[in-house]
Amino acid sequence: MQTYDAGTFDVIVVGAGHAGVEAGLASGRMGAKTLMLTINLDMVAFMPCNPSVGGPAKGVVVREIDALGGEMGRNTDKTYIQMRMLNTGKGPAVRALRAQADKWDYQHEMKHTIEKEENITLRQGLVDRLVIEDGVCKGVITNSGAIYYAKTVVITTGTFSRGEIIVGELRYSSGPNNQQPSVKLSEHLEELGFELRRFKTGTPPRVKSSTIDYSKTEEQPGDDHPRAFSFDTVEMLLDQLPCWLTYTNETTHEIIQANLHRSPMFTATKKGTGARYCPSIEDKIVRFSDKPRHQIFLEPEGKNTEEVYVQGLSTSLPEEVQREMLRTIPGLENVEMMRVGYAIEYDAVMPDQLWPSLETKLVEGLFTAGQINGTSGYEEAAGQGLMAGINAARKVFEKEPVILGRDQAYIGVLIDDLVTKGTEEPYRLLTSRAEYRLLLRHDNADLRLTEIGHEIGLISDERYERFLAKQSAIEAEKERLQKTRIKPTAEVQAMLKEIGSGELKDGILAADLLRRPEITYDKIAQIVSRETFVTDEIAEQVEIQIKYEGYIQKSNLQVEKMKRMEDKKIPENIDYDAISGLATEALEKLKKIEPLSIAQASRISGVNPADISILLVYIEQGKIAKISK
């Protein structure tokens, strides 16, 4: 095919899903001339699976993206149809916001946001190959022969990467939602020497709302006072739609059991590794055979569509079996299936082939982000896309990459897990993966990351000023409560008795009273007058910081200990073969991962404390040898 020079850019982003849009917006907003290429312009930021954003750990990631200057939180706040805060009865470390999105509004709003950016060119095109010169990525070549040149390239092709859809015995080449897949780029990555693996994910059928008998289901409304994902959002949308809860039953399970021989999950048809934390209904029936029923949530896909997402019923069983099992579920006896559920297999680049900046080790100037790195979920993809976009732009401007620590953000935990440990299955972010989850809360994402966002140019001066004012207000109110003494008046004693708290014998500092589990900031505010107005956001922060002060201090001490290990850098040109005493597995893993610090090396599976001790001694001896010379 004849090729032609189609233009030169600073950064090219291949793909415009949830990773691609964050990568492109970050790069463009940082001043890099950015080209975003996508197979279909109508699929920008499309939600091929569940129409929701957030949830445990994932909701915190959305807040972190926003605190750094990304778009997902803002876009969700503009387009949600339901907002709920989860785990409100638990501690602040596991609270999480989850939105039901209008998937069509979400997509259109995000596309228009990109179109308005001066530094971004959004174009339809299918990338087949990369332009590589002397191990450096210099651009991309499309199937129409267009050659686009750039200083860095970010690949965010997601499940389009050599995608194959499977429904029962039917199997065909396709991206999600029957879109054109990206086949030749995967083949090209293999030619370049990248290790790819087949992963699998799935989606449930969509059904017609007007054929559902909602009287047989349980209503799941949104919060009366919804919270925002973005720290920029001032007004919340109040016109919310409910979701609905129903259950499978033994009849449903019998139909599934009778057709397991036709499910790709249990035949040789399925080659890809599926997501452990998002199992298909077939998998659930087999793995949890003692359970008489499983939850099914009916989630509207938008305000202007009849389509309802059947959450909890992900399946790749044949079409007629899907229809039959749907109609055994209470409320769905006469339901019409509008779209069939399916499994999709796709290529993933094994993420231990990446640096923590998300640049590939094999090809300089080439970054990958999103599901192509072996993750599952829109939020995980968006977090990676943001960091890849930031670092691709910073490489153009000859600046050091931004690498978030495990103590700074869930995004840091996610990327460190991927590049240090790799993954054998689609990776899902969980609160249990974070050692310092009390520090990585939903409520304090801005306090952790706004400084970085402003420094790299994604947070405006105006927003940064508001952030500094909030910080000052929190400190001022904490100081006030630490100085204000509450006397054991009749009014105070009555209030304490009413809520089951012990009465005061002497006076007590307001901050010390707030440390009691049953005492909230609102209760303190009732008995301690305030000269200035304190917003709910500031009140929440003051309460958490005072109430959990001891635990937070303990976590910070652990972080300091870990940072001392992070500060012990491993020389770039280290020869692991020259280190005697390392276990064979440790030697292989260290050579493959090429950790940047002793802390990262210690997190590699197969590298034991004894190996770390040997490595430390070797590095120290190397320093001594250099000094003596």
Swiss-Prot record:
A Pfam family: GIDA_C_1st
Function: NAD-binding protein involved in the addition of a carboxymethylaminomethyl (cmnm) group at the wobble position (U34) of certain tRNAs, forming tRNA-cmnm(5)s(2)U34.
Residues reported in the UniProt entry to bind FAD: 15-20, 127, 182, 371
InterPro entries attached to this UniProt entry: FAD/NAD-bd_sf, GIDA_C_N, MnmG, MnmG-rel, MnmG-rel_CS, MnmG_C, MnmG_C_subdom, MnmG_C_subdom_sf
Subunit details: Homodimer. Heterotetramer of two MnmE and two MnmG subunits.
Protein name: tRNA uridine 5-carboxymethylaminomethyl modification enzyme MnmG
Species of the source: Listeria monocytogenes serovar 1/2a (strain ATCC BAA-679 / EGD-e)
Family, as annotated: Belongs to the MnmG family.
Chain sites annotated for binding NAD(+): 274-288
Gene3D superfamilies, sorted: FAD/NAD(P)-binding domain, GidA associated domain, C-terminal subdomain, tRNA uridine 5-carboxymethylaminomethyl modification enzyme MnmG/GidA
SMART domains given in the database record: GIDA_assoc_3
Record region (Disordered): 203-226
Tagged with keyword Kinase: no
Co-factor(s): FAD
GO BP: any one term: tRNA wobble uridine modification
Annotated compartments: Cytoplasm
PROSITE patterns: GIDA_1 (PS01280), GIDA_2 (PS01281)
GO-annotated molecular function: flavin adenine dinucleotide binding
Alphabetized UniProt keyword annotations: Cytoplasm, FAD, Flavoprotein, NAD, tRNA processing
